């Protein structure tokens, strides 16, 4: 339904964040998470802990996710969805020397890909449904290698 983007502009020496993404810029962590998502993720975790299957729990929260997107996206929170981007919901960060850009597919972002992948592997091994140590709206589905797609790039400028 929506897309996110995190962009580095070499000309402006800035990072632009639209949607749920994360970065480490000059050794400082930044994120742009969806304002409604944590509450819905907590509901999913509670449903699973109370005995509902992960698939059923995901289906149970899907109407809330869709409603939150249609009510809030590009009105309170910036996303890419084919309508004009809600510019007050974007984030611009100046860069002086180093940049790590990543999607929200990494529960914990680290300065290196190796460390970010290791943290993801630990999360998947210890809490594959993302209901305890990293609360999320979805967990690992059989046949997938992770709970979400992911992208990572590290630059020195």
Predicted regions and their residues:
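Short beta-strand segments in beta-sandwich/barrel cores
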Residues: 21-23, 106-107
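Short loop segments at secondary-structure junctions
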Residues: 28-29, 157
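Generic preference for flexible, low-structure residues
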Residues: 31, 46, 115-117
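C-terminal catalytic subdomain
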Residues: 61-157
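"…together with the soluble PPM/PP2C metallo-phosphatase catalytic core" -> "…together
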Residues: 1-17, 23-28, 35-97, 151-152
